Design a protein with these regions (language model features):
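Intrinsic disorder and flexible/low-complexity segments
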Residues: 1-119
């Protein structure tokens, strides 16, 4: 299965396409988006997007009513319908994160008196 993100300003965000066809946003949520981001090699997700946020999509959809647990390694492992009732303004999308969810990066800056911790 080939997953791509289309229409976003960079490689970590866009409308989700599976084998060249869009995914419908009916029931689309953060768990679904997490599976997509993980499948694309990103460690986490910032947001699941709806309503073709990254541009209108073709009206022939690959998946509808996607329902993931967040533990799947592939979007195709998630429950979904193949028959859709979606329009070009119902593309599902993601904004993937380059950092693990909940992790803060800590930087210690050494000064003359004492270190400064920057989060």
């Amino acid at each position: 299965m080939n997953i791509t993100l289309v229409g976003g300003p960079n490689a970590q965000q866009g409308n989700v396409f599976v084998n060249g066809m869009p995914v419908c946003d009916d029931g689309w949520d953060l768990k679904d988006a997490l599976v997509v981001c993980n499948q694309l090699g990103f460690p986490s997700v910032l947001r699941a997007t709806e309503s073709s946020e990254f541009g209108r999509v073709p009206t022939t959809f690959r998946m509808d009513d996607v329902e993931c647990t967040g533990e799947e390694t592939s979007l195709l492992e998630c429950k979904h319908d193949r028959i859709d009732d979606c329009g070009s303004n119902e593309g599902a999308g993601v904004i993937c994160s380059l950092d693990y969810a909940g992790n803060q990066k800590l930087k210690i800056v050494q000064g003359l008196a004492r270190p400064i911790f920057i989060f």
